[in-house]
Swiss-Prot record:
PANTHER family xrefs: GLUTAMINE-DEPENDENT NAD(+) SYNTHETASE, NH 3 /GLUTAMINE-DEPENDENT NAD + SYNTHETASE
UniProt keyword terms in alphabetical order: ATP-binding, Ligase, Magnesium, Metal-binding, NAD, Nucleotide-binding
Keyword field contains Ribosomal protein: no
Cellular component annotations (GO), alphabetically ordered: cytoplasm
Organism: Pyrobaculum aerophilum (strain ATCC 51768 / DSM 7523 / JCM 9630 / CIP 104966 / NBRC 100827 / IM2)
Pfam families xrefs: NAD_synthase
Oligomeric and partner information: Homodimer.
Domain of life of the native organism: Archaea
Protein name: NH(3)-dependent NAD(+) synthetase
Binding site for deamido-NAD(+): 123, 156, 163, 250-251
InterPro entries: NAD/GMP_synthase, NAD_synthase, NH(3)-dep_NAD(+)_synth, Rossmann-like_a/b/a_fold
Lineage of origin: Archaea, Thermoproteota, Thermoprotei, Thermoproteales, Thermoproteaceae
Length: 267
């Protein structure tokens, strides 16, 4: 039972049509042959890849499996099931040797700061994706959703380093609903996890379930409800969410630079 019904706030067929048209037009305008996308076996990459196939055809979508030392076997199985269901070309790049070689070059590397250590993995994946994008004249299609974008729950210049985000307007719960409608009901039920360290789950790190987080985001940012009203239903989670949004807004803006207009000479 939802206080703020974020799941039913969307016309899914219309959203699907808008997103597939967007993918097709964006790729065409870029003069690209298609897209390359990391497929993890999670709900976001599954939905993004499925919509890309619908928009472009399976021949123009390249899927990359990029497991690390923290990737469980069930994720690989799910990713392969998605690839087989969609019929796309794919490649597997095990990034563990790259990660091991990288951290060995850092004189003071430590696992103590697991965020700093964990963020190396998505940045390696970004580099691999852009290698194949450059090689085959493809665009890197990101898989971030609106919940992650608002929260800043992604790695800067990692999974945030992409050319476009087709599901960036959908909340996590809406992505799950769309996944079920696209025929991926089992994946829609999987707990979300970036797999940046052993036992890592998104909801464990965020401190609340997406069932709660998405209602807070939807109420505050779409319905424009005052935080004190939303706090009456969800308590301190509202403050946690709003604080995270404010703290991570820099992830959604270009790098800052000074305005030197006063120093320019009129010549």
């Amino acid at each position: 039972m939802f206080v703020y019904d974020v799941v039913n706030a969307l016309d899914y067929e219309k959203a699907r049509s808008i997103i597939t048209a967007f993918i097709s037009q964006y790729v065409q305008r870029a003069g690209s042959r298609g897209v390359v996308v990391g497929i993890s076996g999670g709900v976001d990459s599954t939905v993004a890849a499925a919509l890309a196939v619908e928009a472009l055809g399976r021949q123009r979508v390249l899927g990359l499996l990029m497991p690390s030392l923290y990737t469980p076997p069930e994720d690989l199985k799910d990713a392969l099931d998605v690839i087989n269901a969609l019929g796309v070309e794919w490649k597997r790049v095990d990034i563990t040797p790259i990660y091991d070689a990288f951290v060995k070059t850092l004189p003071d590397f430590s696992q103590e700061n697991r965020v700093a250590a964990g963020n190396i993995l998505p940045r390696i994946r970004m580099t691999v994706l852009y290698y194949y994008a450059n090689k085959y004249n493809l665009l890197v299609m990101g898989t971030g959703d609106r919940s992650e974008l608002l929260l800043g729950y992604f790695t800067k210049y990692g999974d945030g380093g992409v050319d476009f985000l087709p599901i960036g307007s959908l909340f996590k719960l809406q992505v799950r609903e769309l996944a079920a409608r696209l025929g991926f009901a089992d994946i829609a039920k999987k707990p979300s996890s970036p797999r940046l360290w052993q036992g890592h789950t998104a909801e464990g790190e965020l401190g609340a379930s997406y069932e709660v987080i998405d209602q807070v985001l939807y109420a505050v940012f779409d319905l424009k409800k005052p935080p004190e009203e939303v706090r009456g239903f969800f308590g301190e989670v509202v403050d946690i969410v709003i604080t995270r949004v404010k703290k991570n807004i820099h992830k959604l803006t270009p790098p800052a630079y000074p305005d030197i207009t006063p120093a320019r000479r009129n010549v």
